[in-house]
C-alpha cells in the first residue's frame, strides 16, 4: 500500500472511531507497527490526527462552544448524574473543614448530601449561598459584580478577597474539559475567580458530568493535569479528551 493510501485510511479510521490503537491500525493496513508509528508521527505533525500513547485520536472530536447555556437550562440536564457526583463529593467534606464552593449545577447538587459538622463555606454563587444557609451552615459570600446568567459573583475584587482565605478543600465546576486546553469556561471574569480559588485550596476537585468532556470554551482556568475530577463515567469515548489526566485522579461514583 502506498504511503498516501495509508495516510488516507488512517485518517478515516481515526475520524470514524474517535480513537484507534496502533495495533488496530497495523492489522487493518496489514502493515508493520514500525511503519504505522512513523505514519502517525507524520500525520500528527501535519495536524491531521493527534498521536497519543498507544495510538491516535481525532482532532475533530473537540467541540468549540462559543455560547454559555442559560442556568435554567443547565439545571434540567443530566440530573441523575449530577446528583451522583454531588453525593460523592459531599462525602469528601469532613468535620471542621473550611470549604470553597464554586458556581455550577454539579457543585450545587452537593448541598443536600453534606453531612459534616462545624463546617464553614465560602462561595461566589448566590444560589449556593442561599441553599447552604437554608441548611443552617455558616456561609460567607464573596463580594464583586453579580452575573445574572449564572448567579456568580465575579471580578477583581472577588479575586482580591479570595487571597485572604486558606481553604482545606474546594469544589469547582467546569463548562468544558479537553487535554490540550485544560478546564474551560466562557467568561474571563469567572475564569479568574476559579483560578484564584484553586490557588487558595489545599485540595481541589473539579465536578463535571461526562457531557463536558471534549468541549472547549473561550477561557482556560487551569491546565493542571493533577487536578482531581469527579465525573459520572469515563469510557473510551471520553478518555480520548483527557489522556494526560492520570486515572488515579478520576473519581466515578
Question: Where are the language model's segments positioned?
Answer:
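Conserved phosphate- and dinucleotide-binding cores of soluble alpha/beta proteins
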Residues: 2-5, 9-12, 22, 51, ...
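Hydrophobic alpha-helical segments
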Residues: 36, 79, 83-87, 126, ...
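Short glycine/serine/threonine-rich phosphate/pyrophosphate-binding segments
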Residues: 106-110, 213-216
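Short glycine-rich, polar/acidic loop-and-turn segments at beta strand-coil junctions
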Residues: 62, 105, 126-127
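HTH-adjacent hinge/linker in prokaryotic transcriptional regulators
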Residues: 2-5, 15-23, 28, 34, ...
Amino acid at each position: 500500500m502506498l504511503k498516501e493510501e495509508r495516510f488516507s485510511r488512517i485518517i478515516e479510521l481515526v475520524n470514524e472511531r474517535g480513537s484507534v490503537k496502533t495495533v488496530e491500525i497495523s492489522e487493518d493496513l496489514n502493515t508493520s507497527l514500525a511503519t504505522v508509528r512513523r505514519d502517525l508521527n507524520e500525520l500528527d505533525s501535519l495536524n491531521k490526527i493527534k498521536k497519543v500513547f498507544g495510538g491516535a485520536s481525532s482532532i475533530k472530536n473537540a467541540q468549540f462552544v462559543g455560547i454559555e447555556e442559560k442556568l435554567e437550562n443547565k439545571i434540567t440536564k443530566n440530573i441523575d448524574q449530577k446528583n451522583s457526583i454531588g453525593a460523592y463529593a459531599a462525602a469528601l467534606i469532613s468535620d471542621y473543614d473550611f470549604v470553597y464552593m464554586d458556581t455550577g449545577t454539579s457543585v450545587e447538587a452537593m448541598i443536600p448530601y453534606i453531612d459534616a459538622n462545624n463546617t464553614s463555606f465560602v462561595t461566589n454563587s448566590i444560589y449556593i449561598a442561599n441553599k447552604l444557609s437554608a441548611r443552617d451552615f455558616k456561609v460567607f459570600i464573596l463580594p464583586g459584580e453579580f452575573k445574572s446568567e449564572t448567579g456568580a459573583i465575579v471580578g477583581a475584587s472577588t479575586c482580591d478577597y479570595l487571597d485572604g482565605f486558606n481553604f482545606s478543600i474546594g469544589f469547582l465546576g467546569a463548562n468544558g474539559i479537553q487535554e490540550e486546553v485544560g478546564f474551560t469556561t466562557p467568561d474571563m471574569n469567572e475564569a479568574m475567580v476559579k483560578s484564584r480559588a484553586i490557588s487558595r485550596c489545599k485540595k481541589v476537585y473539579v465536578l463535571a458530568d461526562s457531557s463536558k468532556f471534549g468541549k472547549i470554551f473561550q477561557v482556560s482556568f487551569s491546565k493542571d493535569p493533577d487536578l482531581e475530577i469527579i465525573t459520572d463515567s469515563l469510557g473510551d469515548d471520553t478518555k480520548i479528551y483527557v489522556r494526560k489526566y492520570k486515572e488515579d485522579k478520576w473519581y466515578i461514583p
